[in-house]
From Swiss-Prot:
GO terms assigned for molecular function: ATP binding; ATP hydrolysis activity; RNA binding; RNA helicase activity
EC numbers, comma separated: 3.6.4.13
Gene: RRP3
Motif (DEAD box): 221-224
Lineage: Eukaryota, Fungi, Dikarya, Ascomycota, Saccharomycotina
Enzyme class: hydrolase
Record's protein name: ATP-dependent rRNA helicase RRP3
Length: 484
């Protein structure tokens, strides 16, 4: 028997790389679930705390099925030019968030709007601002902050449409675009500025002659996302650069401790309008899942795309690499697919969105940057290629379909490694989702041969893409941070 000396170290049995990776994955999953439980417990504790009398007096709780405060926009005594634009946009009746928020906003009050994506919240803050702008017609009248570039462009489109008969000038300031071009746009004295926090701060610090000392309206859209992306320090700087005497709107999907602190720092005696504070999915959304083997995940995806030929589809992946690789795979196999993720240039991202919205491409493969706030109409199917890490992200994803009263379908591809997380999502949304049947094994095996061959080529092309991207970005320093 070998004797181990006092200075020797006893060696542990060796594990295979596969077991190490599996153990690490299980550890990460356990930690994520533990953190989720802690966050949920903290949220419940915060919700159970009594609210101050001042806050209670100003809270207006609204459910989507509640009777609206006004049934037509003509009841609001808006200027004719704004009413004409609203009619051109075919806004037949106000949504609950519009019904509750707009009357308070027209009275000049600060607003906290708690509403999910697709609730009509952009118009809820744009209409009061444009109504007030008609009376003033001053430059740099309103500033809207958004956490993501695409969302900023979507907000600009809404302001452009609502202000089309009023001569409203808007500018969108986001990272990835030329600073000098944006500075020239600012010198044209736009009425409304829509921006990501990092880029507007760049201009406040470096663009000669530009300031927001005359600003009248300040909007933080998707404020929870702004804070999740750690824009807090930049927001503090912006708040110091704008007048304290202003009207402020804060819109968020959820009310967190961070939002409470931001509200206290930036709003004065606000009215809080809450449409829905729970994680809910639309009643007209058909949700289901498919249990798939991890090695056959791409094959199941292609099978589904064959089943939904001609439909408008959004596929959600967890990472930029998955998104790029899956879009290449789909194109190799003959599908009209475009990617949307943070490694694309701004022009490429806008190009993908425009192709999808126009119908030139019927499949959009995206990271969660596309899940919130973007105006993508008439999506028939949402496929969760990768299961999201929490129920909130799941609800935001599947909320891209079944909007404005239309029906929709969502399918989640669940591997053995995703099952525990998926069960947590079911528990949170309080729905047991049906399991879709798998295709016949012979059909799946035959399809797998073609998919596997295409996947190998997709991996090669994805590596080339990322190498080219790294070379192109070397030396650049973009201060804007956003979820990719």
């Amino acid at each position: 028997m070998a004797i181990v000396g006092s200075n020797s170290v006893s060696k542990k049995p060796k594990h295979t790389k596969r077991n190490d990776a599996r153990d690490l994955a299980e550890k990460i999953k356990r930690n994520a679930l533990k953190k989720q439980e802690q966050d949920k417990k903290q949220q419940l504790e915060e919700e159970s705390k009594p609210e101050s009398s001042q806050k209670s007096k100003n809270i207006v709780e609204v459910n989507p099925d509640d009777e609206v405060k006004f049934s037509t926009f003509s009841e609001l005594k808006l200027v004719p030019e704004l009413l004409e634009a609203i009619q051109q946009m075919k806004f037949s009746k106000p949504t609950p968030i519009q019904s509750e928020a707009i009357p308070h906003a027209l009275e000049g009050k600060d607003i906290i709007g708690l509403a999910q994506t697709g609730s009509g919240k952009t118009a809820a803050f744009a209409i009061p601002i444009l109504q007030s702008l008609w009376e003033a017609q001053t430059p740099y009248f309103g500033l809207v902050l958004a956490p993501a570039r695409e969302l900023a462009y979507q907000i600009k489109e809404t302001f452009d449409a609502l202000g089309s008969t009023m001569g409203v000038r808007t500018v969108c300031l986001v990272g990835g675009m030329d600073m000098m071009d944006q500075a020239r746009d600012l010198m044209r004295k736009p009425h409304i500025i829509i921006a990501t926090p990092g880029r507007i701060m760049d201009h406040l610090e470096h663009t000669k002659g530009f300031s927001l000392k005359m600003l009248k309206y300040f909007v933080m859209d998707e404020a929870d996302k702004l804070l999740d992306l750690e824009f807090g320090p930049v927001l503090d700087k912006i708040l110091k650069q704008i007048p304290s005497k202003r009207t402020t709107y804060l819109f968020s999907a959820t009310m967190t401790n961070k939002i409470e602190k931001l509200q206290r720092a930036s709003l004065h005696n606000p009215v809080r309008v809450a449409v829905s504070s729970k994680y809910q999915t639309a009643d007209n959304l058909i949700q289901s899942m498919m249990l798939v083997s991890d090695g056959y995940k791409n094959t199941y995806l292609i099978h589904l795309l064959n089943e939904f030929v001609g439909k408008s589809i959004i596929i959600f992946a967890r990472t930029r690499a998955h998104t790029q690789r899956t879009s290449i795979l789909c194109r190799i196999l003959g599908f009209s697919a475009v990617p949307l993720h943070g490694d694309l240039t701004q022009a490429q991202r806008l190009g993908s969105l425009n192709k999808f919205k126009s119908g030139t491409a019927n499949i959009l493969i995206a990271t969660d940057v596309a899940a919130r706030g973007l105006d993508i109409p008439s999506v028939d199917v949402v496929i969760n290629y990768d299961i999201p890490t929490d129920s909130k992200a799941y609800v935001h994803r599947v909320g891209r379909t079944a909007r404005a009263g239309r029906s929709g379908k969502s399918i989640s591809l669940v591997t053995q490694y995703d099952l525990e997380m998926y069960l947590r999502i079911e528990q949170s949304i309080q729905k047991k989702l049906p399991k879709d049947p798998s295709p016949p094994k012979a059909m799946l095996d035959a399809l797998h041969v073609h998919v596997d061959r295409a996947y190998a080529e997709a991996i090669r092309q994805t590596k080339e893409f990322h190498e080219k991207t790294r070379r192109g970005r070397r030396g650049k320093d973009d201060k804007d941070r956003e979820e990719h």
